[in-house]
Regions:
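Short hydrophobic/aromatic beta-strand immediately N-terminal to the Walker A/P-loop
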Residues: 2-4
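Conserved glycine(s) of the Walker
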Residues: 7-13
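Conserved nucleotide-sensing/catalytic segment adjacent to the nucleotide-binding pocket
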Residues: 22-92
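Active-site signature of alpha/beta-hydrolase-fold catalytic machinery across serine-
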Residues: 19
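Hydrophobic positions on the alpha1 helix immediately C-terminal to the Walker A/P-loop
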Residues: 16
Length: 146
């Protein structure tokens, strides 16, 4: 089964997957992929544009291949803000959509703590889209200790 985990930056999408995925499951997480492909000592969130380009291509290839094995393993895919085309594709695959949203105040504090000001715009867009009728929270997660 395909499990698509959505939510704003800093919501706890990776934590949700760590709590639910089994060792045999496939996890496609752009942030983890970037960290795995970056050089030693790389920042966990601030990556060079060339690295991100490579990681995005690798992510697409991983998604394409993983979709061929949904009858054998569960595939956890982080997709922060899937647009209509992606949501329709996930629906055709009978994906389960999980939205992780601990609340805007908590998310904004986590993004500030990560010192990633560029993510503030993504958080704003995510909540704006949600208020317009986009994704609805399925999972409320309390704040976690870092």
């Amino acid at each position: 089964m395909l499990i698509v985990v959505t939510g704003p930056p800093g919501a706890g999408k990776s934590s949700y997957i760590r709590a639910h995925a089994r060792p045999v499951d496939i996890v496609i997480d752009l942030a983890l992929m970037a960290l795995a492909m970056a050089g030693p000592g790389a920042d966990h969130h601030d990556h060079h544009p060339v690295l991100l380009r490579v990681v995005h291509r690798a992510r697409q290839a991983a998604i394409h291949e993983a979709e061929r094995h949904l009858d054998q393993v569960d595939v956890y895919l982080i997709h922060t803000m899937p647009q209509a085309k992606a949501r329709a594709h996930y629906k055709r695959l009978n994906a389960r959509i999980i939205t992780v949203d601990p609340g805007e105040h908590i998310v904004r504090q986590r993004v500030r703590d990560m010192r990633q000001p560029a993510m503030e715009a993504v958080v704003t867009r995510w909540y704006r889209d949600r208020r317009k009728g986009g994704s609805r929270p399925v999972t409320r997660q309390s704040s976690r200790a870092w």
